[in-house]
């Protein structure tokens, strides 16, 4: 199976290929076939203009083939960089993008895609009660120019990656929801830190209430 490049229907290829893999035993495929399918699936996911969540592919064992490849392990790394909105990792891997014909042809789209990923990651890292983000903050976290921030947010809202509203006067985005996604170990570590910070805050509040209220409580 090859990517139907003439039709540029990468999303359809991606979904069809994953459905096919769900119906077969990977052990029945040759190493070459597994590698080819993992490669094409990864490229299709990246260049598609409608796929922004790679969770199903990241969890699929066929992707392990790329991790074992000296030539194409970077492609797996690139998928995970997109998943966590890692701009630094994207820049490190940019040489591989320019050397790959299909990815290079979609380089502008890929850059916009990583900016969107950086935006959703920035929102995800913040607690639900602290998701009113100024355009300046978003610009700093996504490396997008200030004059392009409103368009970036509107794009994320239109794609269903975020939900919320934009205050154009004060230049603030009020985000109420961010699309769930698969977390890698670095993201799990960040989530653990947030939970520990929250637990510490709750304990401090409990100690303060206990000290301030002493034995007098009103119901």
Across the structure, where does each feature detected by a protein language model lie?
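Charged, E/D/K/R/S-rich low-complexity terminal regions of large eukaryotic assembly subunits
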Residues: 1-22, 26-219
């Amino acid at each position: 199976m090859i990517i139907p490049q003439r039709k540029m229907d990468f999303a359809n290829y991606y979904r069809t290929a994953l459905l096919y893999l769900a119906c077969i035993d990977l052990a029945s495929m040759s190493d070459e076939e597994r590698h080819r399918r993992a490669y094409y699936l990864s490229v299709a996911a990246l260049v598609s203009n409608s796929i922004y969540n790679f969770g199903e592919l990241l969890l699929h064992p066929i992707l392990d083939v790329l991790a074992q490849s000296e030539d194409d392990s970077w492609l797996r790394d690139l998928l995970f960089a997109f998943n966590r909105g890692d701009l630094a990792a994207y820049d490190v891997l940019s040489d591989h993008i320019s050397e790959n014909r299909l990815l290079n042809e979609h380089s502008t789209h890929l850059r916009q895609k990583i900016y969107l990923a950086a935006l959703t990651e920035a929102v995800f890292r913040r607690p639900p009660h602290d998701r009113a983000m100024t355009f300046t903050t978003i610009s700093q976290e996504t490396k997008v120019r200030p004059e392009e921030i409103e368009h970036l947010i509107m794009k994320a809202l239109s794609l269903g990656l975020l939900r919320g509203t934009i205050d154009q006067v004060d230049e603030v985005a009020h985000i109420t929801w961010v699309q769930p996604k698969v977390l890698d170990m670095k993201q799990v570590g960040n989530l653990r830190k947030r939970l520990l910070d929250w637990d510490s805050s709750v304990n401090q509040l409990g100690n303060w209430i206990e000290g301030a209220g002493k034995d007098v409580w009103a119901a």
